[in-house]
Amino acid sequence: EATLRMLYEVQRQAIPELTRVFGHTGLYLRPCEALAPALSGNMLAQVLSLYREGGRLRGELACEDEALPVASGTVSLAYALCVLETSPRPEALLGELARVLKPGGVALLITLNPWGLARLRWSFRGLDAVDPAVLGQWLAGRGLDIERQRWLGPMWAPPRGTDLQETPAGGLLAGLRAGHLVVARRREAGLTPLRAGKPALSLRPGMSAG
């Protein structure tokens, strides 16, 4: 199916981000059972893989979106592939992903691009795309700082038999790709974003602060 091939291509382009995350445990949420449960490219010892079925998540465990059966602060990577769009409570699901992350842990979130050409394939299915600006607000409110974000995936999922590879497109055209990737890191305990203030005093040899 064209949609599945599009999702695999989006995942393929996100692999470089996976290789930057190390640790013991990861959590992988995918939009359907048809997608492979293995998270290709990850550098973790083990990954709990769940998929969307109706309004719940199933797989190695079964749960509601707002009650992931994972202890707080135990996951090095939370990888969510197009599951916010199908969630009955996307903001609550994001809150759960933030909860299970260790301080310094990484959330890798891939959402459908609400302005991409490929939206014509899924908009009629009742999926509600998450605006990247809104997603950024949700992350900030849950102690996650965005490190990188970009558009990725193909412009359009072509018919079966067509080679689906990334086409060179940047600038304004990049915003027409199928997906949007956000890499966010959970703030270390006790750290808050710095506010702009007076420049720090620079001491020269022989000077003291007092």
Please report, for each region that a protein language model flagged, where it lies by residue.
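Class I SAM-dependent methyltransferase SAM/SAH-binding core
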Residues: 12-68
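A short acidic, Gly/Pro-enriched loop at the edge of an enzyme's catalytic core
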Residues: 66-78
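Short alpha-helix
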Residues: 126-153
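Conserved class I S-adenosyl-L-methionine
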Residues: 106-134
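A short SAM/SAH-binding and catalytic strip from SAM-dependent methyltransferases
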Residues: 76-89
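C-terminal lobe and adjacent flexible extensions of AdoMet/dcAdoMet transferase-like proteins
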Residues: 142, 167-210
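A short glycine-rich, Lys/Arg-flanked "PGG" loop and its adjoining helix->strand segment in the class I
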Residues: 91-106
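Conserved catalytic loop of SAM-dependent methyltransferase domains
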Residues: 147-179
